[in-house]
Amino acid sequence: MLRFGLCCIFLKEPIKFRRTTAKYLQAFSRNQQLENLSAICRHNAEALQKALRYCRDNKIKDFRINSQILPLKTHPAIGYRIKELSAHEQIIRTFKHGGKFCRDHDVRTTLHPDQFIVLSSPHSEVFQRSVADLIYQAEVAQWVNADVINIHGGGA
């Protein structure tokens, strides 16, 4: 069955996913960084719920989740484990609620990690960071009941 879907961002709907930068967060203590990231991740989990409801209400059967739904998750200096975030239980619960919603309403979710995920890289550091990012994407996929993670398979 052919499913038309939405990709990550809404132009006209008041559904916004938040991001941040490592440069911005580096000005703060580690605790402040984690609190900021916790608020952003909680917001993004809630925004995903709105996006999924929008898809259901408009008979859109697929939604591609932005690869930065948990911003900077695997960043070498700012990265974090989800359990380090003060709102981690609420964040995970909200994502899992989204997964149940998708099952109940036949809305498919997919993920598409960024183009810098290069498993074929001859550089060990690039390969290791790619694997870490895919593990993070797989964790999110499990929470939201996503059955596909598209990856780039190009040469190095």
Residue ranges and their predicted role:
Residues 1-107, 117-120, 125-128, 139-144:
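Alpha/beta catalytic barrel-like cores
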Residues 131-156:
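Eukaryote-skewed repeat-based solenoidal scaffolds used as protein-protein interaction platforms
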